[in-house]
């Protein structure tokens, strides 16, 4: 319904702690928390921003939250989360592998999540192959795309994603965050 899937909102009770760790990205956190509470999640997210702003880390936090992955397990170790660097895997065959695997339900989590970093590096053929799956996504699949160059992502892909523009976190906000962590850990900092 309208590109958003309706899920049981109670399935996500108490698992948004990782989202709270996304300091300086209040709009993204608020939007995702509201989507989780209402049970209406987009099937594809697009994270944009300059290099080093935290797009890949944010993608992993979103994946951890959606699939309720415990802190003791790395997101990259989870069998229902697949991460692909489009800079190294630009071709249509790489995307077709994902599309083929996406047909199968997740093994141990609510969703199969595909994180595609540097998505703007995909070839035209790869984008075209991906488009059909984005138009009619399996209910158990979520895509998280990250890019530094939004202009290179076709509008047909952009229009099927919920977009978040990540901003560099202000130094004062970071400083306050580190002070809070140090205080909780009983560590003194200058």
Tell me what each language-model feature is.
Residues 1-163, 169-183:
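P-loop/Walker A NTP-binding region and its immediately flanking N-terminal helices
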């Amino acid at each position: 319904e309208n590109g958003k899937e309706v899920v049981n909102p109670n399935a996500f009770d108490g698992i948004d702690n990782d989202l709270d760790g996304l300091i300086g990205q209040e709009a993204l956190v608020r939007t995702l928390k509201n989507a989780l509470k209402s049970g209406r999640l987009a099937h594809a997210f697009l994270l944009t921003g300059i290099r080093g702003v935290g797009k890949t880390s944010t993608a992993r936090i979103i994946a951890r939250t959606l699939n309720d992955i415990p802190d003791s397990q790395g997101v990259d170790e989870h069998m229902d989360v697949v991460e692909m660097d489009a800079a190294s895997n630009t071709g249509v065959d790489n995307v077709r592998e994902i599309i083929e695997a996406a047909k199968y339900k997740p093994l141990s989590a609510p969703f199969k999540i595909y994180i595609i970093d540097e998505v703007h590096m995909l070839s035209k053929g790869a984008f075209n192959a991906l488009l059909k799956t984005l138009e009619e996504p399996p209910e158990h699949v979520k895509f998280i795309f990250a890019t530094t160059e939004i202009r290179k992502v076709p509008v047909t892909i952009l229009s099927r994603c919920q977009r978040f523009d990540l901003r560099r976190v202000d130094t004062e906000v970071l400083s306050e965050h580190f002070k809070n962590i140090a205080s909780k850990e009983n560590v003194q900092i200058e």
